[in-house]
């Protein structure tokens, strides 16, 4: 029903049915869901920050569908990055992966990465857009766990990632 009406990936629905991190792959109308182990040694340096700018998911999907880019090559790169995310034991490398992922998605949807457009002054780590890019939450890395930069911008809902996700 989802694929024929909303055209979404189904990822959010898949997440509702599990109590652990997953790797989600969609090829046409086929989906593959695998359990993922994600509990890096730098988990204390990862935070979710609520932006309160819910995006229209349907509009985002329509814009993505119209975009012109090498989808096959981009998917290969993103799959490699995802594999590296799961194996990553170093915050600096994790941040490099975030930047690479943001760059690929930015080109695909013709939107600047949020760190370059909205949070250009943030220098203590990297920022990863989540969901429909620029909506409800961002993932933030920080080397010294000081998130004053975001609080000074009125973003006070800051949740340590380890409190929000099941790390099992």
Label each PLM-derived region with a short phrase.
Residues 2-7, 11-132, 139-168:
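C-terminal nucleotide
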């Amino acid at each position: 029903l989802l694929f024929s009406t909303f055209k979404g990936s189904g990822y959010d629905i898949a997440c509702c049915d599990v109590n652990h991190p997953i790797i989600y792959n969609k090829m046409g109308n086929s989906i593959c869901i695998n359990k993922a182990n994600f509990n890096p040694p730098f988990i204390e340096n990862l935070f979710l920050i609520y932006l309160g700018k819910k995006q229209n998911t349907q509009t985002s999907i329509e814009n993505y569908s119209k975009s012109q880019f090498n989808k096959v090559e981009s998917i290969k790169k993103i799959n490699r990055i995802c594999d590296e995310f799961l194996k990553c034991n170093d915050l600096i490398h994790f941040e490099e992966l975030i930047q690479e992922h943001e760059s690929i998605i930015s080109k695909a949807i013709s939107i600047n990465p949020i760190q370059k457009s909205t949070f250009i002054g943030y220098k203590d780590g990297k920022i990863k857009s989540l969901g429909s890019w620029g909506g409800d939450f961002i993932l933030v890395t920080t080397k010294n766990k000081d998130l004053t930069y975001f609080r000074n911008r009125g973003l006070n809902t800051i949740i340590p990632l380890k409190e929000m996700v099941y790390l099992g």
